[in-house]
């Protein structure tokens, strides 16, 4: 059975989710997270994708992403980051096989009120998982940059419906 084609909406943001195969960890230590963030930066520049929010958990990742250059740029971004991380991770931990479960999921987010809730949902993921008590205490999300002004070379900024959020 063929895969369902991705929907591309020009000037829309997407909630992207990629999970480890069988919910296995895709990050085991801080250097794995840092490497993944470097890959995001590299492929963001290469493809022109914009990252408005992110959270890297041990076994999955979330992004709010915009792809001004179409579906191919978004796919190139996710493939480049995912494949590069998998090759490094598998080599580092002497493992073989797929690191990521299936292909990444993408959900179109058209309305600003939905995006505002999505920012909170993504950045509070480590709070819901009881890893930290506040999102700003988690080192692998965009909360500190977006809400507290900490420098983050990965993040782009978007203003939502005059809220100043984003």
What are these regions (language model features)?
Residues 62-64:
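N-terminal functional module of multi-domain proteins
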Residues 1-57, 66-166:
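Short Pro-Cys-Gly-centered "Cys-loop" motif that presents a nucleophilic cysteine in a tight turn
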